[in-house]
Amino acid sequence: NKLFQLPITYYTEADQWSNSPGLRADKIVTDKPVTSRCLECHTSFAEAISGPPLEPMEFDHNKIILGVDCERCHGPGARHVEFQTKNPQEKSAKFIVNPASLSRQLQLDACALCHGSNLKKTKPSFQFTTGKNLADYFTISSLNDNAVNNGNIDVHGNQYGLMAASKCFRMSQQL
């Protein structure tokens, strides 16, 4: 029930294989664990079965749905699906988060879960959902200027921090 990252990844847009994010080009690593922090963004329904609550190490692989899905941005959907299935004539979505109805900060928090790498957990994994305040679940570190200046930001770079630090973003109340 432990998960490990493959050392290479196929990028469909580029139609090529490359080193997986976070791995060095000069060393093949086959034992890099996939952590709960990875699963919070890249799966749904990950359920920890062992390890400390902040960083469990084993997961029920029968329940995990791989990839980014609707729940990442719209919150838990079971009640929504159940209601809409029983009420197909209802055209107004019920029991689901419409990100457009959230405050600017809550919209940003939903994105920052996966696009703000400088997050340190303060509550157990898999508790944050869209519509909640990210700061209640994570300590949000400021943008690391050294990483920006040295070009050390990869796919897991702090896109949220980069955007929030931009003049355009700071001068606007819109997203």
Describe each region flagged by the PLM:
Residues 1-5, 31-48:
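N-terminal export/assembly segments and adjacent metallocofactor-ligating motifs
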Residues 1, 5-7, 19-24, 47-175:
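Primarily the internal scaffold of c-type cytochrome electron-transfer domains
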Residues 7-33:
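Extended active-site and interfacial segments that coordinate phosphate-rich ligands
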